[in-house]
Amino acid sequence: MGARERLIVGLDVPTIGEAERLVSTLGDDILFYKIGYQLVFAGGLEFARDLAASGKKIFLDMKLLDIDNTVASGVENIAKMGMSMLTLHAYPKAMKAAVEAAAGSGLCLLGVTVLTSMDADDLAEAGYSQDPHSLVLRRAGQARAAGMGGIVCSAEEAAAVREIVGPDMAIVTPGIRPDGSDKGDQKRVMTPFDALKAGATHLVVGRPIVKAPDPRDAARAILSEMVSALWPANR
């Protein structure tokens, strides 16, 4: 799997028109896109279907969490849409229900561990006694036990997570920032090079590409950095 299959560009824009222009600008350089709530609520599900039909891969970032039956029903419908990845919060019952619902569909289910915008203070405020690292590892183990296809975590935890989940699960890391980039609202960040070296399989990059003066140049620079991290292993 090369850099192009590993880079996921976050379409974190408010309208379908802006998303269409960005996809057109990035052209064949980018294969994989993330679509989340912002775009979904602007009509993004139909846009996601169209992108998938055109040959792009779609990571639908819905972070589902509900009672088992509701999660299963939602996953069954999403599995029919041609999406490549879907997120849900890494709670054991929800994950098990989702895995059963997605069986045989080819949809890769990802368990969200701890948001990269959260640190220990944020977790404490939310009532958690564990630090981010410990909670990520616990939820990664639960995701593996549930039969999930991968997890979402900070690249800071990727190496430790790999030891828990084994060699086959995807490790998808947001909070990717090239050297010199503004962190924005992210708190646990890493460069593309370091994230891949730490064991991430896929990198989610939004603002450093979307908000760049030339998004295509920004994407190509990140892809080049990723290639250098993968060489000579070419994983």
Curated annotation (Swiss-Prot):
Xref: Gene3D superfamilies: Aldolase class I
Listed PROSITE patterns: OMPDECASE
Any Pfam family hit: OMPdecase
Catalysis: reaction(s): orotidine 5'-phosphate + H(+) = UMP + CO2
Keyword Lyase: yes
Alphabetical keyword list: Decarboxylase, Lyase, Pyrimidine biosynthesis
Metabolic or biological pathway: Pyrimidine metabolism; UMP biosynthesis via de novo pathway; UMP from orotate: step 2/2
E.C. designation(s): 4.1.1.23
Catalytic residues in the record: 63
SMART domains reported in the protein's UniProt record: OMPdecase (SM00934)
Gene Ontology biological process terms, A to Z: 'de novo' pyrimidine nucleobase biosynthetic process; 'de novo' UMP biosynthetic process
Database matches in InterPro entries: Aldolase_TIM, OMPdecase, OMPdecase_AS, OMPdecase_bac, OMPdeCOase_dom, RibuloseP-bd_barrel
Binding site for substrate: 12, 34, 61-70, 116, 177, 186, 206-207
Keyword Aminoacyl-tRNA synthetase: no
Gene Ontology molecular function: orotidine-5'-phosphate decarboxylase activity
Cellular component annotations (GO), alphabetically ordered: cytosol
Function: Catalyzes the decarboxylation of orotidine 5'-monophosphate (OMP) to uridine 5'-monophosphate (UMP).
PANTHER family per the UniProt record, alphabetical: OROTIDINE 5'-PHOSPHATE DECARBOXYLASE
Subunit structure: Homodimer.
Family note: Belongs to the OMP decarboxylase family. Type 1 subfamily.
Record protein name field: Orotidine 5'-phosphate decarboxylase
Organism: Rhizobium johnstonii (strain DSM 114642 / LMG 32736 / 3841)
